[in-house]
A protein has these predicted regions:
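N-terminal accessory/capping or targeting/presequence segment of soluble
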Residues: 1-82, 140-141, 200
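Flexible, acidic/His-enriched mid-domain "rim/lid" segments that flank
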Residues: 4, 45, 77-178, 189
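Residue-level signal for pocket-adjacent positions within structured domains
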Residues: 22-28, 54, 118-121, 178-179, ...
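Short helix/loop capping segments that flank catalytic or ligand/cofactor-binding pockets
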Residues: 29-30, 58-59, 101, 192-195
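Acidic/histidine-enriched ion/cofactor-binding microenvironments in catalytic or ligand-binding pockets
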Residues: 42, 84-85, 178, 191-204
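Short acidic, glycine/serine/threonine-rich loops at helix termini
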Residues: 61, 104-105, 125, 194-197
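Short pre-catalytic strand/loop immediately N-terminal to key active-site residues, enriched for Gly-Thr
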Residues: 69, 132, 197
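Basic, ligand-binding patches in group-transfer machinery
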Residues: 184
């Protein structure tokens, strides 16, 4: 069962007319669109990806199951315009991921917002064959990068220099980029739970 089919099952089970997806990672997961601005509207009959002019070509190439909307106004205004035009009123949304201000703005008008917190996250918990292969590829890149950096670190290097070498090697091996800030913390900084690389030098 593909990702969109599972979202349509949520729509049916929750008696919704549509689901709005605003979070970056759920938008990317469901549409394959990697741009940093946009929203999805998923209905039983049609799927929309709303973005701005900078990403139209990219969205068209990546999100082939979606109708691409080049927004002319704010993202929320464009969403509401489509919902009104398509006569969609019972709307699922990521209640645990959007701000209060966004909720208030969406809630103006003749729609009913219904939180589907964690429902899309549950879909993402079960990996398909392609996703498993990508995880295995990522793990291999991390292993190879770690072995490489052990041969590169020397006394006097800064944490930032090590970070740069790590990330450069990961890209060389085929990574798109780090999932989060690369953690490099030495000496007394090693106790930090999320030690973002600094100008501290490696000591003996």
């Amino acid at each position: 069962m593909n990702k969109l089919r599972k979202v349509l099952d949520i729509i049916e089970h929750k008696h919704l007319d549509a689901i709005i997806v605003l979070s970056d990672y759920n938008r990317r997961y469901l549409s394959d669109f990697t741009g940093t601005s946009g929203a999805l509207i998923i209905t039983p009959k049609k799927q929309y990806l709303i973005t701005d002019f900078r990403y139209i070509d990219q969205a068209t190439e990546q999100a082939q199951d979606f109708e691409i909307i080049n927004r002319k106004s704010s993202l929320i205004s464009e969403i509401k315009s489509i919902l009104e035009r398509e006569n969609l009123s019972n709307i699922g949304f990521e209640g645990h991921l959007i701000s209060y201000d966004t909720y208030v703005e969406l809630n103006k008008g003749l729609i009913t917002l219904i939180s589907i917190s964690n429902e899309i996250d549950k879909i993402r918990e079960i990996k398909n064959k392609e996703e498993i292969q990508l995880i295995q590829k990522a793990a291999k890149i991390v292993d190879q990068t770690y072995e490489y950096i052990l041969t590169q670190v020397s006394i006097g290097m800064t944490e930032r220099e090590i970070k740069a070498k790590l990330e450069s090697k990961m890209l060389e091996l085929g990574a798109d980029g780090p999932s989060f800030d690369t953690i490099v913390a030495s000496g007394y900084r090693g106790a930090l739970p999320h030690g973002v690389a600094s100008d501290k030098r490696i000591e003996k």
